Amino acid sequence: MDAKNTTHRIGQTGPVEKQTGIRHLFAAASYSLGGAKRLIGEAAFRHELIAFAAAMIAFIIVGATFFQYVAMAILFLLMMAFEAINTAIEEIVDRVSPEISEMGKNAKDLGSFACLCLIVANGVYAAYVVIFDGFMN
């Protein structure tokens, strides 16, 4: 069995046959749920989740349009994805390079910057909808 047809899960000692068809779909969904559970363990993600809930409450108060809710949800999903990638980068760097290195620091800083960009985008958009579209109208 070649390397591209194997998947390793925690606790397994050898290669496992890759699932195909509908089993692959369920396996992929299981891995995604595992990633979501892992992401909930990150304090930064929990803070972002609270901020999203606050934005949704503010959108309700100002009477945001359906499009504005959809745009905010898309921005939040992007932020979740970037937070997941950033967490993966941090875990890989910590595993591969437990000592402090410039390359590891750069990788972590770049992942963090990507998250910051989306946090700012989410905040600016939410503020625009609430302040300019909501209270100014």
From Swiss-Prot:
Annotated active site residues, numbered on this chain, are: E83
Catalyses which reaction(s): a 1,2-diacyl-sn-glycerol + ATP = a 1,2-diacyl-sn-glycero-3-phosphate + ADP + H(+)
- Chain segments annotated as transmembrane: 49-67, 73-89, 112-132
Which keywords annotate this record?
A: ATP-binding, Cell inner membrane, Cell membrane, Kinase, Lipid biosynthesis, Lipid metabolism, Magnesium, Membrane, Metal-binding, Nucleotide-binding, Phospholipid biosynthesis, Phospholipid metabolism, Transferase, Transmembrane, Transmembrane helix
User: Where located?
Assistant: Cell inner membrane
Kindly list the cofactors needed.
Answer: Mg(2+)
Listed under GO biological process in this entry are: phosphatidic acid biosynthetic process
Record's bilayer topology term: Multi-pass membrane protein
What Gene Ontology molecular function terms does this protein carry? ATP binding; ATP-dependent diacylglycerol kinase activity; metal ion binding
Q: Which GO terms describe its cellular component?
A: plasma membrane
Instruction: Report residues binding a divalent metal cation.
Output: E42, E90
Domain of life per record: Bacteria
Q: Which Pfam families match?
A: DAGK_prokar
What Enzyme Commission number does this protein have?
A: 2.7.1.107
Q: Which InterPro entries match?
A: DAGK, DAGK_prok, DAGK_sf
Q: Give the function comment from the record.
A: Catalyzes the ATP-dependent phosphorylation of sn-l,2-diacylglycerol (DAG) to phosphatidic acid. Involved in the recycling of diacylglycerol produced as a by-product during membrane-derived oligosaccharide (MDO) biosynthesis.
Assigned protein family: Belongs to the bacterial diacylglycerol kinase family.
Name it: Diacylglycerol kinase
Give the species this sequence originates from.
Answer: Sinorhizobium sp
Q: Which gene encodes it?
A: dgkA
